[in-house]
Curated annotation (Swiss-Prot):
Organism field: Camelus dromedarius (Dromedary)
Molecular function per GO: N-acetylmuramoyl-L-alanine amidase activity; peptidoglycan binding; peptidoglycan immune receptor activity; zinc ion binding
Keyword Secreted attached: yes
Lineage, top ranks: Eukaryota, Metazoa, Chordata, Craniata, Vertebrata
Cleavable signal peptide: 1-21
Predominant cellular place of this UniProt entry's protein: secreted
GO biological process terms on file: defense response to Gram-positive bacterium; detection of bacterium; innate immune response; negative regulation of cytokine production; peptidoglycan catabolic process
Name of the featured protein: Peptidoglycan recognition protein 1
């Protein structure tokens, strides 16, 4: 009887360790997958080497959105412009942030973006706030969504724990991410000029 108990305990421990090894990755909050915002199929194939060291924050400089429906439409508009007008393989950003407090999946954690030029695209994740932030500030829920996304990236192993945030204007001659948003990201603990 004792031998059977030992075998049973050993089998249960083995099963528990298998379950722990197969546990799902950490939850990443409100990331709207491409299919939910009705993205066009991506033709992009070039992968990022993970974990990535840099995050480049930009703004789309267009209309802002503050509901899931309007933000899904805005994500479609940005993607359509990038694909149809610029000839890119997909929306240029890895993620888009809406004023609704949701993150919209662009190219995601694994595919190289087209957001910051040939030097920075292969070594960074591009996060773009949907709207123009020259004279206005994104609402707190949008800023929280961005911060949560960055924590998610670290938890998933997509971003280094010592990642660096840069404004689009830090790596390219542009006004992006807008004066007001730029002031905010400069206060983030991972920001480096």
């Amino acid at each position: 009887m004792t031998r059977h108990c030992v075998l049973l305990v050993w089998a249960l421990l083995a099963l528990l360790s298998l379950g722990a090894a197969r546990e799902d990755p950490p939850a990443c909050g409100s990331i709207v997958p491409r299919r939910e915002w009705r993205a066009l199929a991506s033709e992009c194939r070039e992968r990022l080497t993970r974990p990535v060291r840099y995050v480049v924050v930009s703004h789309t400089a267009g209309s802002h959105c503050d509901t899931p429906a309007s933000c899904a439409q805005q994500a479609q508009n940005v993607q359509s412009y990038h694909v149809r007008n610029l000839g890119w393989c997909d929306v240029g950003y890895n993620f888009l942030i809406g004023e609704d407090g949701l993150v919209y999946e662009g190219r995601g954690w694994n595919i190289k973006g087209a957001h910051a030029g040939p030097t920075w695209n292969p070594i960074s994740i591009g996060i773009s706030f949907m709207g123009n932030y020259m004279n206005r500030v994104p609402p707190p829920r949008a800023l929280r969504a961005a911060q949560n996304l960055l924590a998610c990236g670290v938890a998933l192993g997509a971003l280094r724990s010592n990642y660096e945030v840069k404004g689009h204007r830090d790596v390219q001659p542009t006004l992006s991410p807008g004066d007001r948003l730029y002031e905010i990201i400069q206060t983030w603990s991972h920001y480096r000029a």
